[in-house]
From Swiss-Prot:
Function: Allows the formation of correctly charged Asn-tRNA(Asn) or Gln-tRNA(Gln) through the transamidation of misacylated Asp-tRNA(Asn) or Glu-tRNA(Gln) in organisms which lack either or both of asparaginyl-tRNA or glutaminyl-tRNA synthetases. The reaction takes place in the presence of glutamine and ATP through an activated phospho-Asp-tRNA(Asn) or phospho-Glu-tRNA(Gln).
PROSITE patterns found in the cross-reference section: GATB
Keyword Nucleotide-binding attached: yes
UniProt organism field: Pelagibacter ubique (strain HTCC1062)
SMART domains: GatB_Yqey
Protein's GO biological process: glutaminyl-tRNAGln biosynthesis via transamidation; translation
InterPro entries attached to this UniProt entry: Asn/Gln-tRNA_amidoTrfase_suB/E, Asn/Gln-tRNA_Trfase_suB/E_cat, Asn/Gln_amidotransferase, Asn/Gln_tRNA_amidoTrase-B-like, GatB, GatB_C_1, GatB_Yqey_C_2, Gln-tRNA_amidoTrfase_suB_CS
GN (gene name): gatB
Keyword flag Protein biosynthesis: yes
Protein name per the record: Aspartyl/glutamyl-tRNA(Asn/Gln) amidotransferase subunit B
Annotated EC: 6.3.5.-
Length: 492
């Protein structure tokens, strides 16, 4: 098997196979109420406490479209550079399951609210474009709970009727890394827009992964299998790896691949068959007679476009142009809207004498390390942007060294303490007086005369020894730049 950032190939005997991947992402719409009822969508509520008569499919109850959910879907479509359809139709998708009280799901089949679009991925080997086939609105089902009662399956209808956007990609992805980048980019766009929170651990973003394999260089698509409801990027990558190899092994053994729906077992790290894959006619789609076609005007769409915030790709370009950061650094900074906000606040608080390199390094290095260690989001950062900017300025103006700054940063974490106060209380101000440093270096050279002679005779590696001695004697407070300059003069 060949794996790198640009290709993912499976080698068997005389054949080399490539993997073809498409995703159907189910994104829960950020909305206070459901798609066709006024019931709350609050996560974590007690079972069956957020269920209206419409959600429970009581006879005679009619759905009423939530305009806000429609706006959220259109905004997402705009963010995906997609065609917004001024006329869309809600259909009934007919199937039976215990947590689907209507006996059908209200979805969109032939006429979705959003058409084709694109998502640009920043990969290590360059940019990759993934096509969007469509985005349609649909209602979520309830939740079946199998592990609370040994004899029965329990049903919680709190989720029933919650608005979902199903975002269907084209089969343009070829590697697990591209799938990871696609999910992250999609989540980032929706978080910028405020249309989906993207919290996979809460189930508000999950995906069906469609996989097929074919001989490298072939244009013909293989038989695809769908892996249902994968709710983490790590599991998606593991599922793709297992399923692709399973399909290749079947082909190499002369067997056929069945078109089917499969489940990823997270304990065994393997996929297993659930049922044969349904085609559209199996669901007997037809327009919902209780809902008129949804029609929106150009004016309605333009008004939503005017409210679209700066999105990741545009923000990345601005960061590169305005702040002179690298494309790689900009990609990291804009990938999460809260990180981008934090960075811009740090830059604003740094004042006129800005050092962008220091700002980027401290945010993506020291701060990210603390957040990862404490399992915190940047919005929960124990160090405010204001105080991090102060710390960076103290380094920039020579008040403290980078080494001392790391010590101060560790102290700042406990209570978001002003770094200037720490410097004053702990006596950590950097020694930058040339005369004082000359006297210190003269003493070090005098104490180590033999090494000074060796250095002058060509043993240049000893320069680091003298720098180390200067930092040791000064308690780490000596200005490293001045130490280097003075030592070079003294040791000539």
């Amino acid at each position: 098997m060949t794996k790198d950032n640009s290709e993912y190939l499976i080698e068997r005997r005389d054949n080399v196979y490539e993997v073809v991947i498409g995703l159907e992402v189910h994104a829960q719409v950020t909305s206070n109420s459901k798609l066709f009822s006024s019931s709350s969508t609050t996560f974590g509520a007690e079972p069956n406490t957020q269920v209206s008569l419409v959600d429970a499919a009581f006879p005679g109850m009619l759905p009423v479209i939530n305009e806000y959910c429609v706006k959220q879907a259109i905004k997402t479509g705009i963010g995906l550079r997609a065609q917004i359809n001024k006329r869309s139709v809600f259909d009934r998708k007919n199937y039976f399951y215990a947590d689907l009280p209507q006996g059908y799901q209200i979805s969109q089949f032939k006429y979705p609210i959003v058409g084709e679009g694109t998502v640009i991925l920043d990969m290590a080997h360059g940019q990759k474009e993934v096509g969007i086939e469509r985005l349609h609105l649909e209602q979520d089902a309830g939740k079946s709970i199998h592990d609370m009662d040994p004899q029965n399956t329990l049903v919680d209808l709190n989720r029933s009727g919650v608005a979902l956007m199903e975002i269907v990609s084209k089969p343009d992805m070829r590697t697990p890394d591209e799938v990871s980048a696609y999910i992250k980019k999609l989540r980032s766009i929706m978080r910028y827009l405020g249309t989906c929170d993207g919290n996979m651990q809460e189930g508000s973003l999950r995906a069906d992964v469609n996989i097929s394999v074919r001989i490298k260089g072939s244009d013909k698509l293989g038989t695809r299998c769908e892996i249902k409801n994968v709710n983490s990027i790590k599991f998606m990558q593991m599922a793709i790896d297992y399923e692709a190899n399973r399909q290749v092994d079947l082909i190499e053994d002369g067997k056929t691949i069945d078109q089917e729906t499969r489940l990823f077992d997270t304990k065994k790290n393997e996929t297993r068959s659930m049922r044969s894959k349904e085609d559209a006619h199996d669901y007997r789609y037809f327009p919902d007679p209780d809902l008129l076609p949804l029609e929106v005007t150009d004016e309605f769409i333009e008004k939503l476009k005017a409210d679209i915030p700066e999105l990741p790709d545009d923000k990345k370009k601005r960061f590169i142009d305005e702040f002179k950061v690298s494309a790689y650094e900009a990609t990291i900074l804009v990938s999460d809207i809260e990180t981008a906000k934090y960075f811009e606040e740090v830059v604003a608080k740094m004042g006129k004498n800005k050092d962008m390199k220091l700002a980027v390094n401290w945010i993506t290095g020291e701060l990210f390390a603390v957040l990862n260690n404490k399992n915190l989001e940047i919005s929960e950062s124990p160090v405010s942007a204001k105080n991090l900017a102060k710390l960076i300025n103290l380094i920039k103006n020579g008040t403290i060294s980078g080494k001392i700054a790391k010590t101060i940063f560790e102290l700042m974490i406990d209570g978001d303490i002003d770094p200037q106060i720490i410097v004053e209380e702990k006596g950590l101000k950097q020694e930058s007086d040339p005369k004082a440093l000359e006297a210190l270096i003269d003493k070090i050279i005098d104490t180590n005369r033999e090494k000074a002679i060796e250095y002058k005779n060509g043993k240049e590696k000893l320069f680091g020894f003298f720098v180390g001695q200067a930092m040791k004697v000064s308690g780490g407070k000596a200005n490293p730049q001045l130490i280097n300059e003075i030592l070079k003069k003294k040791l000539q």
